[in-house]
């Protein structure tokens, strides 16, 4: 499964050593293919598209991040483009038919 993971810094800044550890951790995830991409925000924090077998595996990975307790998280599961289109279209047609009476 793919997830969009957003990390937003909390009120306490990390130490320079924590920052370095977090940067190295992210670089390792990019190198091994765990992360498809990572982008940062000008004001701090950022997003990653990551691959995980399931929610529990993603949570495990998040807790391994060196700044885990210093950021707040927003996680969204992702679908591949067009994944689920047939189901959505069928449900739209069903709803349209129901409204037509």
Describe every region a protein language model picked out.
Residues 1-101:
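Conserved, structured core segments of small domains
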